[in-house]
């Protein structure tokens, strides 16, 4: 999909750059593959804010997307590509030979009429899914499982991908876009190709209201708050915060390591680049 640049006929259109979605399905999603969705406003079951600056936005329905791809050796035809408000990538409606319908993450270069299939030995083309052990080294993949049968967890956002760089003693070595190099069991599934909508990062909303439609509220810096609200708050006039950058709860930020999952440390060969 191309980017759509707007002429400044109104102040809010000046500088606005959006994704041109004219090739996507303009109707409603398949009702049997959707479910109602309640907004949390960033609050948990106690009513406390667990994710700040979230709230409002247009009402959405959740689309069931097949991240597992366990329908082996049944060819499916792509009926159409659709917009999904729950993710940055586009989704593809697939109709299998037995009549079943399913949504999958749409990879780049996939279009209506193409055929996709999942299996132990299938063609290396975008949209096909297979175990990492059957994929040639050097292939670009997405929607990668971390645990066999649990469904894809890595490389699912718009434009993302990972590269299979090696295989050794039942494990596959995956290089992520962050620079991290990690190993995954060879039985885990992955889908060929990179995720659709790579221009998502080049969008420019143009006005605050467009972010509010997406459920994003204004993001306030700590230095403009009061001392009761943030460690950087307070002071007469504009201040720099007076201390090293911390979160609202006093923990160091900007490069501070927070990873605590020691159980899977052995599966990470090289940590991601942090810019420090």
Swiss-Prot record:
Pfam family, one: Ribosomal_L2_C
MF annotations from Gene Ontology: rRNA binding; structural constituent of ribosome; transferase activity
SMART domains linked: Ribosomal_L2 (SM01383), Ribosomal_L2_C (SM01382)
GO biological process per UniProt: cytoplasmic translation
Keyword RNA-binding: yes
Gene3D superfamilies: 2.30.30.30, Nucleic acid-binding proteins (2.40.50.140), Ribosomal protein L2, domain 3 (4.10.950.10)
The keyword Ribonucleoprotein appears for this protein: yes
Keywords, alphabetical: Ribonucleoprotein, Ribosomal protein, RNA-binding, rRNA-binding
Cellular component terms per the entry's GO annotation: large ribosomal subunit
SUPFAM superfamilies named in the record: Nucleic acid-binding proteins, Translation proteins SH3-like domain
Disordered: region residues: 30-52, 224-257
Biased composition (Polar residues): 41-52
Top-level taxonomic group: Bacteria
Its job: One of the primary rRNA binding proteins. Required for association of the 30S and 50S subunits to form the 70S ribosome, for tRNA binding and peptide bond formation. It has been suggested to have peptidyltransferase activity; this is somewhat controversial. Makes several contacts with the 16S rRNA in the 70S ribosome.
Quaternary assembly: Part of the 50S ribosomal subunit. Forms a bridge to the 30S subunit in the 70S ribosome.
Family: Belongs to the universal ribosomal protein uL2 family.
PANTHER family listed in its UniProt record: LARGE RIBOSOMAL SUBUNIT PROTEIN UL2M, RIBOSOMAL PROTEIN L2
Protein name: Large ribosomal subunit protein uL2
Lineage: Bacteria, Pseudomonadati, Pseudomonadota, Alphaproteobacteria, Acetobacterales
